[in-house]
Design a protein with these regions (language model features):
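Exposed loop/turn and edge beta-strand positions of beta-sandwich/beta-sheet ligand-binding modules
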Residues: 1, 35, 73
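Residue-level preference for long, well-ordered alpha-helices that form the structural scaffold
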Residues: 3, 7-10, 79
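Short, contiguous alpha-helical
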Residues: 8-12, 16-22, 27-69, 108-158
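Acidic/histidine-rich alpha-helical segments that form the ligand environment
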Residues: 74-108, 115-138
């Protein structure tokens, strides 16, 4: 299995987990923060929804495109639609480049000016997984049920 094939397989496995995390966010708790300096739950969920639109351009042009204003005022339905659309586009964009381009194509953004497409794409995926974990801790603190992500949740069948 190539690195690119593995990335696509992991992306396919993780997509429903991101969806579960967004679905678990109560509609009336988007503004919830665990601490004043923390991001809101809605902002974290919105990032999970649109992160894929940032990774797609890495595969194609070597540079992510991220608009933080996209994270504002999204409903849960908007987030779920963006997630589905972004995941579909990302898969198509990664599939469209050769394994060689994935492995050796140059990518750059911010301090990571001399990176590769595969490394930067994986970093953005891991960043999304990290933020999903943050959101999940918010969900329980809000009094909502935590979905199973990698295994059973203490909230299953309750």
């Amino acid at each position: 299995m190539t690195n690119k094939t593995f990335f696509l397989a992991v992306l396919k496995e993780e997509a429903p987990r991101f969806k579960k995390a967004i679905e678990a966010l109560p509609d009336d708790k988007h503004g919830y923060k665990v601490q004043e300096r923390s991001r809101t739950a809605g902002n974290l969920a919105a990032q999970l929804a649109v992160q894929w639109k940032a990774i797609s351009p890495i595969a194609i042009s070597g540079s992510p495109k991220f608009d933080p204003h996209e994270l504002d005022n999204l409903t849960k339905a908007d987030m779920l639609a963006e997630l589905d659309k972004g995941m579909t586009q990302l898969q198509a964009d990664v599939e469209s480049i050769s394994d060689e381009e994935w492995e050796t194509g140059q990518a750059g953004w911010g301090e990571a000016k001399n990176d590769t497409k595969y490394h930067m794409s994986w970093a953005f995926l891991f960043d999304a997984i990290h933020h999903r974990g943050q959101l999940i801790t918010f969900i329980r603190a809000m009094g909502a049920k935590v979905p199973s992500i990698y295994g059973p949740s203490a909230d299953d069948d309750k």
